[in-house]
């Protein structure tokens, strides 16, 4: 500001605007009415801008025009204020200076101003080339200035508007936007404006209809026949919820914030009146409401888009193919033959999805069918669920050899699945803040079904060849799809969801006439769907007792194969971060060794050692290595080493160390992991009390994640430690760093310098917002020789080093480590030397306390 009058003008307008906003925000806090808020905020800004325009005495031949959302007549607390400075011609230097002063004043008023300076010709030319500009001008609104000039813009804009072209451009833009958000409204941190099912989807519909002069409100679309009254009411209600969420987010963040970030979800939920219960956080209750609204928006959005498209692009050849007297196929879409079909014949609801699976060429449901399903929700009641015909139809859908995943997803999108399986409805939109699931429970369940179905599809056999091989020989695989549908169906009820889900599964099987044999398998899978994962990732698979106990739980090969396939599909369906090749190897190893036990193989130490020795010798001979050269190294190692290592790993270590068994210097060897992901690193050195911590510290500094560790001590005091590590940042390209790891880690071990203090590693926002209470469990194993140390906590960089340093401080040696990272949570299991712990109970207590301190956030 150059002059005192302008300073005074700015101060007066700013103070007035600030006071108006405070009053409006207080009203909103009191009544939670979002529509009056965004309207009154817009009016307050209108007044501020027109006063600034008048105060600066802008020329009368210029027009100040509101565009975008502001032009639409609504303004959220911290939204951009988009304006167009419409000129009659190119501005001279004097005009440009005045316009710059006006824009500067707007910023001084505290407005997030978005401005453009154009003539009418500029607007028409640029809107033709840019769909964003064309859209912003659709809702242009004159604030002050040259009315005739603004009218000229409107006339030319409307004359140039091609509704069909606009529809196609906005549809493409929407698809690109949805792809950016993975085509799902069910993100952990959805954007209430831009994500699928968000406010932008509603705006796109109204932009399309306004461009086609079909209406610019849900009421008008109802009057034009594009919506039913009920659909218009539903859209109005969900739009109001999304608007309220967006306004609350802005106010909580104190800035423009459209993403429901973890940091704000709890405060936002409390602003809506939600409170934490025994089974659900307040944030989970709010997010479920959001997901239901977004789902409804997505569903109605699909109906409206297809209807608008049909009006703008009437097909000249509306060829239909009759399927039966209830359904036809029209241009690849399954269509009902009468609007009231589902009310007259409720059986046709499930028949829709069976025909969708069975009819070649059908790729979706027509607008008429989608609308019919949407409006038939009241028909889907208890009597409909209990109808024997419907039960036969649903079982047929699940047993169909193709199209199952797509059919179930479509049933969920149209809310039919949740209305048929009423317990499924309870978990629709239920988020799991357990730090490793990234999908809502219903989406996770359908993802697991999809993963198992892919094992059965020839085109996907390259993804998991072993699983595909097992699936190909599995009789009646549909029992697996049913088990997948029920494995997490009891989440969020309180209690053990596996046992509660088992009851649901048995009831379903009884109601649907499923045989006793298949019922028992389905129910057993639901009850034990976590068992194999727990054994593989937390127990010692080289312990014959562990494998025998697991084999007793499983009982036979069919149950084992079914559980293995479900476990792989389940872990892969939690999050892209959770599955890795190492977990795959552990599960496959457990499957194969258990199958041997079930087949009658002996599982005693001597027979296993004999088999391992023969396999290792075969591996060595494949590499043209004389097995006799292995004797000096093998004579130094206990039988436990051979029991805990794979034959190919023993062969690799033998070839790497056979001529270095008495090396005075550390020997470090690294190779691409045979598991298919990451590195395998071996360290051979004179044993040190803090060796495990020292190695963990190196891996922490290099940002490697340790997946597994095996710690051995030779009879003459050497340590032979092997590690399975990964580095997410390398994206699988590890070859260039093998030599670097061997050199640097060797130096780190050789120097034996004091252990540095652990760093307080960074936590993800999710972990900060939903911390879990650290847990430490220390108990002796059955033989009393070792102690099992189980640790669970929020994951963070350097956590394993912090644990290892505490163990080193107390001179507790690590025998093995099983590192289980589940998204943002770790569940690690260590086998530690029990000699000192057994002799001193106080040491156990102090160790547990020090570990809890190290795990604390």
Swiss-Prot record:
The disulfides recorded in the entry are none
Q: Name one GO biological process term.
A: regulation of nitrogen utilization
Q: Where does the record place the ACT domain? A: 680-760, 788-857
The UniProt keywords, alphabetically, are: Hydrolase, Magnesium, Multifunctional enzyme, Nucleotidyltransferase, Repeat, Transferase
Q: Which GO terms describe its molecular function?
A: [protein-PII] uridylyltransferase activity; phosphoric diester hydrolase activity
Q: Pfam families of this UniProt entry?
A: ACT, GlnD_UR_UTase, HD, NTP_transf_2
Catalyses which reaction?
Answer: [protein-PII]-L-tyrosine + UTP = [protein-PII]-uridylyl-L-tyrosine + diphosphate; [protein-PII]-uridylyl-L-tyrosine + H2O = [protein-PII]-L-tyrosine + UMP + H(+)
Know anything about its domains from the record? Answer: Has four distinct domains: an N-terminal nucleotidyltransferase (NT) domain responsible for UTase activity, a central HD domain that encodes UR activity, and two C-terminal ACT domains that seem to have a role in glutamine sensing.
Report activity regulation.
Uridylyltransferase (UTase) activity is inhibited by glutamine, while glutamine activates uridylyl-removing (UR) activity.
The record's function comment reads:
Modifies, by uridylylation and deuridylylation, the PII regulatory proteins (GlnB and homologs), in response to the nitrogen status of the cell that GlnD senses through the glutamine level. Under low glutamine levels, catalyzes the conversion of the PII proteins and UTP to PII-UMP and PPi, while under higher glutamine levels, GlnD hydrolyzes PII-UMP to PII and UMP (deuridylylation). Thus, controls uridylylation state and activity of the PII proteins, and plays an important role in the regulation of nitrogen assimilation and metabolism.
The entry sums up its family as follows: Belongs to the GlnD family.
Q: Where is this region: Uridylyl-removing?
A: 323-679
TM helices/strands, residue ranges: none
The name of this protein is Bifunctional uridylyltransferase/uridylyl-removing enzyme
State the InterPro entries in the record. Answer: ACT-like_dom_sf (IPR045865), ACT_dom (IPR002912), HD/PDEase_dom (IPR003607), HD_domain (IPR006674), NT_sf (IPR043519), PII_UdlTrfase/GS_AdlTrfase (IPR013546), Polymerase_NTP_transf_dom (IPR002934), UTase/UR (IPR010043)
Annotated region (Uridylyltransferase) at 1-322
């Amino acid at each position: 500001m150059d002059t005192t009058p302008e300073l005074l003008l700015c101060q007066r307008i700013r103070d007035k605007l600030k006071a108006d906003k405070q009053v409006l925000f207080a009203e909103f806090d009191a009544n939670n009415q979002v529509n009056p808020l965004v309207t009154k905020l817009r009016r307050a800004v209108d007044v501020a801008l027109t006063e600034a325009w008048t105060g600066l005495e802008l020329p009368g031949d210029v027009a100040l025009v509101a565009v975008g959302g502001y032009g639409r007549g609504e303004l959220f607390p911290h939204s951009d204020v988009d304006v167009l400075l419409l000129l009659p011609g190119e501005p001279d230097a004097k005009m440009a200076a005045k316009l710059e002063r006006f824009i500067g004043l707007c910023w001084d008023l505290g407005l997030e101003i978005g401005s453009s300076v154009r003539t009418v010709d500029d607007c028409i030319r640029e809107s033709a080339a840019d769909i964003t500009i064309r859209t912003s001008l659709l809702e242009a609104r004159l604030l002050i200035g040259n009315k005739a000039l603004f009218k000229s813009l409107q006339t030319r804009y409307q004359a140039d508007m091609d509704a069909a072209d606009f529809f196609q451009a906005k549809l493409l833009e929407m698809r690109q936007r949805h792809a950016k958000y993975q085509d799902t409204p069910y993100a952990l941190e959805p954007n209430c404006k831009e994500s699928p099912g968000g406010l932008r989807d509603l705006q796109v519909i109204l932009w399309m209809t306004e461009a086609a002069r079909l209406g610019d409100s849900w009421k008008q679309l109802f009057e034009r026949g594009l919506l039913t009254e009920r659909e218009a009411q539903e859209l109005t209600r969900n739009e109001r919820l999304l608007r309220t969420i967006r306004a609350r987010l802005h106010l909580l963040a104190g800035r423009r914030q459209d993403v429901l970030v973890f940091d704000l979800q709890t405060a936002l939920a409390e602003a809506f009146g939600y409170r934490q219960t025994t089974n659900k956080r307040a944030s989970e209750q709010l997010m479920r409401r959001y997901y239901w609204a977004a789902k409804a928006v997505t569903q109605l959005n699909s109906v409206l888009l297809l209807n608008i498209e049909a009006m703008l692009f009437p097909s000249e050849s509306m060829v239909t193919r009759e399927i039966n007297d209830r359904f036809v196929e029209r241009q690849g879409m399954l269509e009902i033959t009468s609007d009231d079909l589902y009310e007259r014949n409720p059986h046709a609801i499930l028949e829709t999805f069976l025909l969708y699976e069975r009819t070649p060429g059908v790729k979706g449901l027509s607008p008429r069918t989608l609308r019919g399903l949407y409006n038939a929700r009241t028909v889907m009641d208890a009597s409909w669920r209990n109808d024997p015909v419907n039960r036969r139809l649903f079982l047929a859908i699940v047993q169909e050899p193709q199209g199952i995943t797509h059919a179930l997803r479509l049933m969920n999108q149209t809310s039919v699945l949740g209305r048929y399986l009423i317990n499924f409805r309870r978990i629709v939109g239920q988020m799991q803040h357990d730090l490793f699931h990234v999908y809502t429970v219903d989406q996770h369940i359908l993802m697991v079904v999809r993963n198992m179905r892919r094992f059965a599809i020839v085109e996907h056999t390259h993804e998991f060849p072993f699983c595909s091989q097992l699936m190909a020989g599995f009789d009646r695989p549909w029992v697996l799809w049913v088990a997948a549908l029920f494995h997490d169906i009891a989440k969020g009820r309180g209690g053990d969801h596996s046992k509660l889900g088992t009851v649901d599964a048995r009831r379903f099987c009884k109601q649907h006439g499923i045989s006793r044999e298949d019922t028992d398998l389905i129910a057993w899978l639901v009850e034990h769907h976590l068992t194999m994962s727990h054994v593989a990732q937390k127990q010692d698979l080289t312990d014959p007792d562990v494998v025998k106990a697991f084999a007793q739980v499983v009982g036979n090969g069919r149950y084992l194969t079914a559980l293995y396939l479900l476990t792989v599909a389940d872990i892969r369906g939690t999050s892209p971060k959770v599955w890795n090749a190492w977990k795959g190897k552990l599960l496959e190893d457990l499957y194969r060794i258990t199958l041997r036990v079930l087949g009658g193989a002996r599982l005693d130490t001597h027979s296993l050692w004999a088999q391992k020795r023969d396999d290792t010798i075969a591996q060595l001979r494949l590499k043209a290595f004389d097995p006799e050269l292995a004797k000096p190294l093998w004579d130094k190692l206990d039988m436990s080493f051979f029991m805990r290592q794979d034959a190919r790993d023993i062969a690799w270590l033998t070839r790497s160390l056979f001529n270095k068994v008495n090396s005075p210097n550390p020997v470090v060897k690294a190779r691409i992991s045979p598991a298919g992901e990451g590195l395998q690193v071996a360290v051979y050195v004179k044993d040190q009390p803090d060796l495990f911590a020292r190695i963990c510290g190196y891996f922490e500094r290099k940002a490697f994640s340790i997946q597994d560790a095996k710690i051995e001590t030779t009879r003459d005091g050497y340590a032979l430690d092997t590690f399975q590590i990964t580095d997410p940042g390398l994206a699988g390209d590890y070859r260039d760093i093998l030599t670097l790891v061997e050199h640097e880690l060797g130096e780190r071990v050789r120097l034996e310098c004091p252990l540095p203090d652990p760093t307080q590693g960074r936590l993800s926002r999710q972990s900060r917002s939903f911390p879990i209470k650290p847990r430490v469990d220390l108990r002796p194993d059955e033989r009393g020789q070792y102690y099992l140390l189980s640790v669970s906590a929020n994951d963070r960089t350097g956590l394993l080093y912090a644990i290892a340093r505490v163990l080193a401080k107390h001179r507790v040696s690590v025998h093995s480590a099983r590192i289980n990272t589940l998204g943002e949570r770790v569940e690690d299991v260590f086998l530690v030397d029990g000699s000192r712990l057994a002799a001193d109970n106080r040491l156990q207590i102090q160790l547990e306390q020090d570990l809890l301190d190290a795990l604390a956030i």
